[in-house]
Amino acid sequence: MLQTMKIELKKLDFSLLWRHSHDFYRVLDANRTRLQSYFFWANKKVTPNFSKTILFMIAYVVDTYYKNIKRKIANSAYDAPFVIMRDNSVAGMIGLDNISPISHDAEIWFWVSQENEGLCVATQSIKKIEDYSLNQLNLQSLYASVVYTNERSKSILTRNNYTIEDIKYNVPISRRNPTITNLIKFRKIITK
């Protein structure tokens, strides 16, 4: 019998963090080795235990709120992080960074726990965030920068009709993660 999954995207906020804090930490800790190559916050030095992980997540929520206030004042870029929930449990995260009301695009990022790989959780989440981007934010395209060795993410983006736009050599993964690598930039024009 085919079992159906309920995949939801919930905006990351204080109440969600409070309700699912232990679930967040469990998923992060179980996937730390895989995630720390791509996300600086997954490193044991940044989030070594439950309380420091939750404090980091609270700081992230505050930073997101600050960027949204700044956006309203100065029409500047902002972020929108979401928690991927599968059957009411944390399955990963997906979000939009550098949402630009001027160029009508944003950078998409995502990760799912190892136990949720191969179940189309990332694919369904990408479709949901594309719908949100188009219908709620009036964006016209999304792009993703992927470490060249991250075969899963490249495959997921390709299956979702993202195409390679650029390759950058010998660059840091992000401004917060100085690890030098090669990045592949994917882009998708989103339409109704």
Regions found by a protein language model. Name each.
Residues 25-28, 66, 70:
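A generic alpha-helix structural signal
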